[in-house]
Design a protein with these regions (language model features):
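Contiguous, well-ordered alpha-helical segments that form the cores/surfaces of helical PPI scaffolds
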Residues: 22-31, 275-286
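Alpha-helix N-cap/helix-initiation sites
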Residues: 18, 204, 252-253, 269-275, ...
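C-terminal engagement/docking regions of AAA+ P-loop ATPases
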Residues: 46-49, 260-272, 283-337
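Conserved hydrophobic residue
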Residues: 34, 156, 216, 287, ...
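Non-catalytic, well-ordered alpha-helical scaffold segments
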Residues: 23, 145, 186, 190, ...
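Conserved ASCE/P-loop NTPase catalytic core
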Residues: 2-205
Length: 337
């Protein structure tokens, strides 16, 4: 019988296509410092399904028992009773308020000397896990800022009437949306580490296969999980091994220089593009169980890291992916295209 307990989530290993989205998610799990991923694409293309499937695939974490912040007991001076739980996968509803997201300070309890002085929000629940925001492009800009700040710093600070409470909020931020419903402001979009684009699969035979697999899974989920259990375990093992080996991955100075040359060639503002492109290439190298970044690692990841950072010119006839590919060929392959 399958060791993956949540039979309501489609197995990650069984998801057909959408390789760009799957790669971006896996690399962020390997190195959360990449900075999250924005997934833009058509409705009904498996965005939510894939994110839930990945969270279910990952190994359990150890926390202090019944702790609302999912605190890691390692390294603490005091010993606590612990429990193993699935990695948190928290979905943020579109109409959420700042109090619902960040938590609330109970002034009456504080003045009365009580213990329940803080009501944790969604950021507390997401600590050491994944925070998913569907239709993030429709979310209030201020709330998006709050999420990005917490994801980058690893902390959530709540202040009210001169009282401040701070707690860990280390999570991978995943946003998704349909570009037809509007884009995020460039200033916010730039703060996401990666940007994956997905499209509806057009090949009829592949569409039929996807439909059949989904219907079969809904009918007999246990059989389906048993069928893919070995592949699930292999992916899980590769991710865990990559996390352990990430610190030992090397990238040559020449490759680092060329990554920066591409960013300069594309007139990308700031250094986030350089940093994330390097981190993503190293994460992919670790995932492939190698010790040194190759040209292919950079080629597979650089578009994910840079496409949302390009200046938008409505008069251009090529898309962002093609533009990055041309810059890659020019600088890495010495092509005069």
């Amino acid at each position: 019988m399958s060791t993956f307990k949540n039979l309501t989530n489609f197995p990650f290993a069984a998801i057909i296509g959408q390789e760009e989205m799957k790669l971006a998610l896996q690399l962020n799990v390997i190195d959360p410092k990449i900075g999250g991923v924005m997934i833009m694409g058509d409705r009904g293309t498996g965005k939510s399904t894939t994110i839930r499937a990945l969270a279910d695939l990952l190994p359990d974490i150890t926390i202090i028992k019944n702790d609302p912040f999912n605190t890691d007991p390692k390294g603490l001076a005091k010993e606590y009773e612990t429990e193993n739980v699935k990695i948190p996968m928290v979905e943020l509803p579109l109409g959420s308020t700042e109090d619902r997201v960040c938590g609330t300070i109970n002034l009456k309890e504080i003045l009365a000397g009580g213990n329940n002085t803080f009501e944790p929000g969604l950021l507390a629940r997401a600590n050491r896990g994944i925070l998913y925001v569907d239709e993030i492009n429709l979310l209030d800009d201020h709330l998006v800022d709050v999420l990005l700040d917490s994801a980058a710093s690893g902390w959530n600070t709540v202040e009210r009437e001169g009282i401040s409470i701070k707690h860990p909020a280390k999570f991978i931020l995943v946003g998704s949306g349909n570009p037809e419903e509007g884009e995020l402001r460039p200033q916010l979009l730039d703060r996401f580490g990666m940007h994956a684009e997905i499209r509806t699969i057009r090949e009829p035979k592949l569409r039929v296969k996807i439909v059949e697999e989904r219907i079969n899974f809904d009918s007999t989920p246990q059989v389906w999980f048993d069928k893919y259990e070995q592949e699930q375990l292999e992916i899980q093992s590769r991710i865990v091994t990559a996390q352990k080996n990430l610190g030992a991955i090397e990238i040559s100075k020449d490759f680092q220089l060329k990554i920066s040359q591409i960013c300069s060639e594309l007139e990308i503002e700031g250094l986030r593009g350089d940093i994330v492109s390097t981190r993503a290439a190293k994460a992919l190298t670790a995932f492939e169980n190698r010790s040194e970044v190759t040209l292919e690692d950079i080629k597979r990841t650089i578009t994910l890291c840079l496409r949302h950072r390009l200046r938008r010119d409505p008069m251009e006839s090529i898309n962002s992916g093609e533009k990055i590919d041309l810059a890659f060929q020019k600088i890495f392959l010495n092509s005069n295209i």
